[in-house]
């Protein structure tokens, strides 16, 4: 059985700042760093480091940064990758990280959106019963929807992390078996108000998660940052608390969670046990700065949880 991840790869440029600039304000960064990232890449690497058998399909540009991304992808032990060349500049993300470990991200997605059903035909042809397909929200709606339908028809369990939120995300959620998202994303899909992170409570998560689960029929995992996650299915809601840590950089925490959760399910873990491992791995990730290079390994996770 194989976890097949279809998604983006980006050149990540980090600016470490005391605070985010207000509209019209300029701020100086204390430091600039680069890493390899993108939700697709991060989730694929997270799953590999958790022990999954991963095939990753992505696209990069036809420019100099693409060469560095290809080297980074090839260097991931245990991951089989198909890296296509799009006729654009390589996708990149500019990530601001504040002193209180929060982040703000702006990304390009021309290469990710260039991927279509035709270019993904070999990936779909390789899907067999028992595989798992993992997608995100960077690609075109039509492509994402078609790939989810075809993979599901081929016997794969389809997992969707609809971030960044695509247009008509509700229609994509309905095509997935499992949906991983945060409370803001869930509220947006449902058309509910999300005031700020202070409303990021277990009660709000259970309420919104139940609505989304009933609307879509999918198992819903709502991530709540330092509060852990909530699982909504046909059974009673399951709440999983996160270990207490001192956060340095929350970038990639959701991707770590998603990759580790999928890896756990591929190993035969229950929803609860897979999510518990994923919450722990995400907590470890936020103690580190960066994206692809900061994703924890199985050995690091085991040491972290005291196993």
Predicted regions and their residues:
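Conserved phosphate-binding/catalytic region of the ribokinase-like
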Residues: 167, 196-307
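A glycine-rich helix N-cap at a beta->alpha junction
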Residues: 72-87
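Conserved beta-alpha-beta core of the PfkB/ribokinase-like small-molecule kinase fold
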Residues: 132-204, 227-229
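Short beta-strand scaffold segments in enzyme catalytic cores
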Residues: 45, 92-96, 104, 228-232
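Active-site-proximal loop->helix
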Residues: 64-76, 95-101, 105, 172
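Glycine-rich phosphate/adenosyl-contacting loop at the front of the ribokinase-like
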Residues: 1-59, 64-71, 246-248
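Conserved phosphate-binding/catalytic loop of the ribokinase/pfkB sugar-kinase fold
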Residues: 85-87, 95-132, 137
């Amino acid at each position: 059985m194989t976890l097949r991840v279809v998604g983006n790869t980006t050149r990540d440029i980090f600016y470490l700042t005391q605070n985010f600039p207000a509209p019209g304000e300029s701020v100086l960064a204390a430091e600039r760093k680069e890493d390899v990232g993108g939700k697709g890449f991060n989730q694929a690497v997270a799953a590999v480091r958790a022990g999954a058998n991963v095939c990753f399909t992505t696209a990069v540009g036809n420019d100099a940064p693409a060469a560095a991304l290809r080297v980074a992808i090839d260097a991931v032990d245990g991951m089989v990758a198909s890296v296509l060349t799009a006729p654009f500049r390589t996708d990149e993300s500019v990530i601001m990280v504040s002193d209180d470990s929060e982040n703000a991200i702006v990304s390009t997605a021309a290469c990710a959106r260039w991927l279509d059903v035709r270019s993904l035909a070999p990936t779909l042809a390789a899907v067999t019963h028992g595989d798992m397909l993992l997608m995100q929200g960077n690609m075109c709606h039509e492509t994402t929807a078609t790939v989810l339908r075809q993979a599901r028809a081929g016997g794969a369990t389809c997992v969707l992390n609809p971030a960044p939120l695509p247009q008509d995300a509700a229609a994509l959620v309905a095509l997935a078996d499992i949906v991983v998202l945060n409370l803001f994303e869930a509220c947006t899909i449902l058309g509910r108000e999300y005031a700020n992170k202070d409303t990021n409570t277990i009660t709000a998560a259970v309420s919104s998660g139940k609505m989304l689960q009933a609307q879509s029929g999918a198992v819903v995992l709502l991530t709540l940052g330092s509060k852990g996650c909530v699982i909504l299915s046909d059974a009673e809601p399951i709440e999983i608390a996160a270990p207490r840590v001192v956060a340095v950089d929350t970038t990639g925490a959701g991707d770590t969670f998603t990759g580790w959760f999928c890896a756990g399910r591929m190993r035969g873990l229950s929803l609860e046990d897979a999510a518990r491992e994923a919450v722990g791995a995400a907590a470890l990730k936020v103690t580190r700065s960066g994206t692809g290079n900061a994703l924890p390994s199985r050995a690091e996770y085991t040491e972290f949880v005291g196993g």
